[in-house]
Amino acid sequence: MSVILAIFIAAAGCLFSSWRIYWSPWACFPGPKLAALSSWYEWYWEVYRKGQLNAHLQDLHASYGPVVRYGPKHVHFNDPALYRDVYKWHPSFGKDPAFYGAPKYSSTFRETNISKHAARRQVLSRRFSPAVVRQRMPVIERHCEHLWQKLDRLTQAGRKNFNFFNLCRSFAADLLSTYMSGTTFGCMDDDEQGFDGNFIRAIQHTSDTYFDNRNIFLARWTSLLKMFGYGPPPLDKMLDELTFSDGLVEDYLSAKDSKGKEDTVFAILTQPGAVKDFSPLSKPELMAEGRSLLAAGVNTVGFTLSSTLFYIARDEDVQLRLQTELDTSTPQQTLASLPYMVGNLSIFILSDRLTLYTRPPV
């Protein structure tokens, strides 16, 4: 009986493996057979090798072409001609829930229902459109002026070296928190000697532990140690990113009634009838959205600012041409109307920064 059972299991395994490799709807895409067989292939490169999947995908493209299958149901493309077809304005297919997990309260970035995502995105576009951002320029200018004043104080005190990535992340966090709730995190003032404030340390801790937290073997081992009282100490709340993002929502809701009419992101997300088929967010939903916006905005804007300024600073010719164009511009001109700012400079920066990114996965 045991022999028959073993034969049956082996036969079922062979059939299942053959189906995934040769007969599934994804079998038409080229790629390693091991990747087609099991999602552990992706886990190995993304989690165990801590983020090496993107680099490995470029090696796969060199071997298999512009479209590569790197999981049982995952493909990756590096042909720009496919971008508009996949990331079109009105998608005909939804996001894969398995990729985003199963959050109790979805945010815009993690919402897998197409109609709900469209309604939430339409609401947010009213606060992040270019026209609205231009109207909020006084807020941006105020934060810029605050940053210049702190840099002046630090340089006058003899400080010559700064963590420029943290500087840009602090600026982004203060600006984004103000834009979202009307109050600022105060990251630029949190560290008197630089820009290593509590929130910046918290998001850095999240980045540093991201792959460890996704490692199911490490998580189960840690849980087992906790059962016997040998687990790691509780996480310092000041290193928990959620302490700050959820606190921003708590502070906004507690003072909402006394603020009157606002034009913040949280305000429009809690207004009834903002757009058709949109329901005002509850407190847990607003917290989920706040976490998502901060996670998507602070590191991204910080990296973009710091890397862009680096590429400008390393080339004196670019600095000179940019400064000349700004000095000779008139008050009536906008940055978008300056040819070098939006033309040659953008191409110069993007051509260098292409080495920092890989093509988006599907």
Curated annotation (Swiss-Prot):
Its cellular-component GO annotations read: membrane
Checking Pfam families in the record gives:
p450
**The protein, known as:** Cytochrome P450 monooxygenase-like protein avaN
Q: In which pathway does it act?
A: Secondary metabolite biosynthesis
Q: Which UniProt keywords apply?
A: Membrane, Transmembrane, Transmembrane helix
Tell me the Gene Ontology biological-process terms attached to this UniProt entry: secondary metabolite biosynthetic process
Signal peptide start-end: none
Q: Which membrane topology describes this protein?
A: Single-pass membrane protein
Q: Which family does it belong to?
A: Belongs to the cytochrome P450 family.
Q: Which InterPro entries match?
A: Cyt_P450, Cyt_P450_sf, Cytochrome_P450_monoxygenase
UniProt-listed SUPFAM superfamilies? Cytochrome P450 (SSF48264)
Q: Where in the cell is it found?
A: Membrane
Q: Does the keyword Nucleotide-binding apply?
A: no
Q: Where are the transmembrane segments?
A: 3-23
- State the function annotated in the UniProt record: Cytochrome P450 monooxygenase-like protein; part of the cluster that mediates the biosynthesis of a highly modified cyclo-arginine-tryptophan dipeptide (cRW). The first step of the pathway is perfornmed by the arginine-containing cyclodipeptide synthase (RCPDS) avaA that acts as the scaffold-generating enzyme and is responsible for formation of the cyclo-Arg-Trp (cRW) diketopiperazine. AvaB then acts as a multifunctional flavoenzyme that is responsible for generating the cyclo-Arg-formylkynurenine DKP, which can be deformylated by avaC.
Q: Magnesium as a keyword?
A: no
- A single GO molecular function term of this UniProt record: oxidoreductase activity, acting on paired donors, with incorporation or reduction of molecular oxygen
